[in-house]
Amino acid sequence: MENPKVSIVLPTYNRIEWLVKSIESVRKQTYQNWELFVIDDISSDGTDSKMLEFCDIDSRIKYFKLPVTEEVGISKFLNFGINNGSGKYIARLDDDDKWIDCDKLKKQVEFMEKNPDYVLIGGGIIVIDSNERELFRYLENETDEQIRKKALLSNPFTHPAVLFRRDSAIKIGGYKVLEFAEDWDFFLRLGNVGKMYNIPEYVAHYLMAGQNISIKNQRELAKNLFGIIKAHKNNYPNYWKGYLINVFQLLHSYLPAFFRTNSTTFLRYIKRKYF
């Protein structure tokens, strides 16, 4: 098997303590042929000086300052990595996530090299709080058939778990500039040009802390998802189920605070059990 390079894209902003953990999780990978693009939205917490230290000790780490704007959002960072990386594959990390499987890249690259008709591979994640205590964990649908069946019901991949073919990402035009769910739309478009798979193993920690989305943004997210689901209705099954789920989520955002808090878990249960 060849030893193709993986370009890892890691956007960051004022999270130096978590960023260090993310970078160290990359450096612990048994698969060594990688380059890491840390793309900084002009942090003010000492990120630049710490990154210079990392660049001095590991030439595979590259640091860029690239201010983002509301008009282009995080898509600007992600497309910068795709367009400027030299790897055959692209992997993703956010500055508050980290890989927990030291063989994550090795396993995913081996699968992709053996299966050239696949364009995207992910894995399971463990969701943690700011004290790194486990909140819950989940494995995504594994096979291409299973993924496609539920691709319009919920996002079939999580960013810190994925690896995809760079040429396929360029072929579909990279990430679209969307206010929300640009990753979900990107994964669905990748699925239009090849097969998808999820390793049935936990490969990453995903931080859930201080990320509560405002009610206004919940409603905007739901409205955005209507457009994404509709755009892919002819490429994936269960369009009306996905549409109905999103209607429920939009209506849920209009409930009084007490009912929203006490119905969220129930809604998640219904979604997983019946959809």
Give the label of every model feature segment.
Residues 32, 40-50, 68, 94:
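A conserved acidic beta->alpha catalytic loop
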Residues 3-6, 27-38, 46, 58-62:
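Short loop->beta transition adjacent to catalytic acidic/histidine clusters or analogous donor-positioning motifs
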Residues 103-135:
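Conserved donor NDP-sugar-binding/catalytic core segment of glycosyltransferases
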Residues 90:
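Short aromatic/hydrophobic "clamp" motif used to bind/position activated sugar donors
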